[in-house]
A protein has these predicted regions:
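Conserved core segment of the aminotransferase class I/II
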Residues: 44-111, 118
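Active-site pre-lysine segment of PLP-dependent enzymes
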Residues: 1-55
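A short linear hydrophobic-aromatic micro-motif
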Residues: 125-129, 161-166
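PLP-dependent enzyme catalytic core of the Aspartate aminotransferase-like
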Residues: 145-146, 153-163, 169-200
Length: 200
């Protein structure tokens, strides 16, 4: 979502005095929009180190909001979690202290691998997509003659390629492909996916 779209959303929310809860975990590298909390006093933004920062294992995230909401969430957190792991906090601190270098590295991976995905989609007659913004995952439509869950399981068992079947998102005949990995791994995975598609 770009800034203009967010400002339209804020105007609608203000008319009815509504909060806007914005999941900013997948913020795009190439279309940086402002955070909802910078546009609206009733904006609530969540983010984490999992996606854009590529540190999913430590499970560290945050909520940004006005003071009233922050106090409610802090009280709730006290009842659900004593504290985060010390190691997790140390890794999170290190990542955030080196934020720009890490984001630049990840931006480069996204750009290069998205170009590989573009090439594969252009060549693969049984695949199509709405090209994603520069984020870490894509949602690809596949021309297959079986339930997508079965397709994904056979792809994993027969070729060692893992995709998330689209029925998990109420979209049959689609798969989610995470493409921010080593380029050679991505190329090999896409080749194997094409091999399996050609057999279907």
């Amino acid at each position: 979502m770009d800034a203009a779209y967010l400002e339209e959303l804020v105007a609608i929310a203000k008319e009815v005095d509504a909060y806007i809860f914005s999941d900013e975990v997948y913020r795009s590298f190439d279309q940086p929009a402002p955070s909802i909390v910078d546009l609206y006093e009733k904006g609530i933004a969540i983010n984490s180190l999992s996606k854009t920062y590529s540190i999913p294992g430590i499970r560290v995230g945050w909520v940004a909001s006005n003071t009233e909401v922050a106090d409610i969430l802090r009280d709730y957190r006290d009842y659900t979690m004593i504290c985060a792991g010390v190691f997790d906090d140390m890794v999170a601190t290190l990542v955030l202290e080196n934020k720009e270098a890490i984001l630049e590295r990840n931006r480069q991976i996204v750009e290069e691998n998205l170009a590989l995905m573009d090439t594969w989609i252009a060549r693969e007659s049984k695949a199509s997509w709405i090209r994603p913004a520069s984020v870490s995952t894509s949602f690809v439509k596949l021309d297959v003659n079986r339930p997508i869950e079965d397709f994904a399981l056979e792809l994993l068992q027969g070729y060692g390629v893992l995709v998330v079947p689209g029925n998990r998102f109420d979209k049959e005949s689609h798969v989610r492909i995470g493409y921010c990995c080593d380029k050679e791994v991505l190329q090999k995975g896409l080749e194997k996916l094409s091999q399996f598609l050609n057999k279907c």
